[in-house]
């Protein structure tokens, strides 16, 4: 029977993901901190943080895992028709802080999100070090949607997305997976299966299979200019 591990400030390592609890699904460890070194170690080993504002830091590796293969995203005809009517522009790494702030905005019917100022600062540090990246959706120079995550070799680990206009986050996801495919990425880690991701074509795979893929891809090479500041296009 698996038991929960408790991390101290000096302990950078994690227990094997296979030791995660089944209830709640994927909970692996408690504690530690959000220093860049620990976060990178977590993602490199298929682990990610998620916790409510008043909780200690919780670390997860759920089974099954939600993933996309870049280029295989499901785009409905109605969504294509809608997006073709929009005069939106898309950029890479133009305003990481604004994207994380947007992701931290409460959703309808919620009082807040788990993305605290501490979380935003932690991922900003990773962005400044070249590991975390954002994709922005603009309308008339106003930020209307976006997403952010980490690049680990040929794997992009998606963290969060937001929208202030209908379908803007879906557009961001479409542009992201097209961009990743062009740059040589092989997998998008979407963490936990949910109806929204399922509607976009996310696949649910066993944790063991995900970890094998991650081990194979996490040191792979991608295009050197994958994350240069740039405007990118959407292909519909």
Swiss-Prot record:
Task: Name it.
Answer: Leucyl/phenylalanyl-tRNA--protein transferase
Gene symbol of the encoding locus? aat
BP term (GO), one? protein catabolic process
Query: Could you confirm whether the keyword Transferase appears in this record?
Result: yes
- According to its UniProt record, which protein family does this protein belong to? Belongs to the L/F-transferase family.
User: Which PANTHER family does this one have?
Assistant: LEUCYL/PHENYLALANYL-TRNA--PROTEIN TRANSFERASE, LEUCYL_PHENYLALANYL-TRNA--PROTEIN TRANSFERASE
**What is its biological role?**
Functions in the N-end rule pathway of protein degradation where it conjugates Leu, Phe and, less efficiently, Met from aminoacyl-tRNAs to the N-termini of proteins containing an N-terminal arginine or lysine.
Record-level GO cellular component terms: cytoplasm
**Could you say which EC number(s) this protein's record lists?**
2.3.2.6
Which HAMAP family does the UniProt entry name for this protein? Leu_Phe_trans
Kindly state which keywords UniProt assigns to this record, in alphabetical order.
Acyltransferase, Cytoplasm, Transferase
- Please give the Gene Ontology molecular function terms for this protein: leucyl-tRNA--protein transferase activity
Source species: Shewanella halifaxensis (strain HAW-EB4)
Among InterPro entries, the record links this protein to: Acyl_CoA_acyltransferase (IPR016181), Leu/Phe-tRNA_Trfase (IPR004616), Leu/Phe-tRNA_Trfase_C (IPR042203), Leu/Phe-tRNA_Trfase_N (IPR042221)
Query: Which catalysed reactions does the entry list for this protein?
Result: N-terminal L-lysyl-[protein] + L-leucyl-tRNA(Leu) = N-terminal L-leucyl-L-lysyl-[protein] + tRNA(Leu) + H(+); N-terminal L-arginyl-[protein] + L-leucyl-tRNA(Leu) = N-terminal L-leucyl-L-arginyl-[protein] + tRNA(Leu) + H(+); L-phenylalanyl-tRNA(Phe) + an N-terminal L-alpha-aminoacyl-[protein] = an N-terminal L-phenylalanyl-L-alpha-aminoacyl-[protein] + tRNA(Phe)
Report the record's disulfide bonds: none
NCBIfam families for this protein: aat
Q: Which Gene3D superfamilies does the record associate with it?
A: Leucyl/phenylalanyl-tRNA-protein transferase, C-terminal domain, Leucyl/phenylalanyl-tRNA-protein transferase, N-terminal domain
- Places the protein is found: Cytoplasm
Q: Please give the superkingdom of this protein's source.
A: Bacteria
């Amino acid at each position: 029977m698996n038991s929960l591990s408790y991390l101290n400030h000096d302990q950078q390592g994690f227990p094997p993901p296979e030791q995660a609890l089944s209830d709640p699904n994927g909970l692996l460890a408690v504690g530690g901190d959000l220093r860049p070194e620990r976060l990178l170690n977590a993602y490199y080993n298929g682990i990610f943080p998620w916790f409510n504002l008043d909780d200690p830091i919780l670390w997860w590796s759920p089974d099954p895992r939600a993933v996309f293969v870049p280029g295989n995203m499901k785009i409905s005809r109605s969504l294509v028709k809608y997006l073709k009517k929009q005069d939106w522009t898309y950029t890479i790494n133009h305003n990481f802080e604004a994207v994380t702030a947007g992701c931290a905005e409460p959703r309808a019917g919620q009082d807040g999100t788990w993305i605290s100022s501490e979380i935003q600062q932690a991922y900003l540090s990773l962005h400044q070090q070249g590991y975390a990246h954002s994709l922005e959706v603009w309308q008339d120079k106003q930020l209307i949607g976006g997403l952010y995550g980490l690049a680990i070799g040929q794997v992009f680990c998606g963290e969060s997305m937001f929208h202030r206009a209908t379908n803007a986050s879906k557009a961001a996801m479409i542009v992201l997976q097209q961009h990743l495919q062009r740059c040589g990425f092989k997998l998008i880690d979407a963490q936990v299966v949910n109806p929204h991701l399922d509607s976009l074509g996310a696949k649910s795979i066993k944790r063991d299979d995900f970890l094998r893929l991650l081990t194979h891809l996490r040191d792979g090479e991608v295009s050197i200019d994958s994350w240069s500041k740039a405007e990118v296009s959407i292909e519909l």
